[in-house]
Amino acid sequence: MNHHKIVRVRDVMNPDFDIVDGAMTVKDALMSMKHPENKCFIVEKRHEDDEFGLLLVSDVARKVLADDRAANRVNVYEIMQKPIIYVDPGMNIRYCARLLERFEITRTPVIENNEVVGIVSFTELVMGGMRDRWEGA
C-alpha cells in the first residue's frame, strides 16, 4: 500500500496573482500586471451575487492581437471567461490535475471562503507536487 503524504493545492499554488476590474481596458490591465508568470488575471466580482472571471494572456492574443483590435478600446469584460471553474485549497493535487484535464484548462483560481487565495496551473501541480516530493524522499 502506498503511504505518501497527500499534497494539497494550498501546498503548491501561487499565492501571488493579479486582480482587475472588468471595466478596465485590456491595455490598462496589461500595464498593471505584476505577476506575468501566472499568464492570467482574476476579474473581480461586481457585486455579492456575481462570480469571479478569468482573463488569460492567450485570450488577449486570440481576441485582441490576432483580431487586430486596439487594446485601449477593448474592455476586459468583453473577452474574459465567466463563470469559471475554480478549486478549493484543500483539494488533493491529483484531483485538481484531473479536473483541469477534464475541462481542458491550464490554470484556475484557488478560492476559499469566497475569496481568491491563489492560482494553480499544471506547472505548480507537477513541479511543486511531484518533483518536490521526490526531492524530499
What positions do the PLM features span?
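Tandem CBS (Cystathionine beta-synthase) repeat/Bateman regulatory domains
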Residues: M1-A137
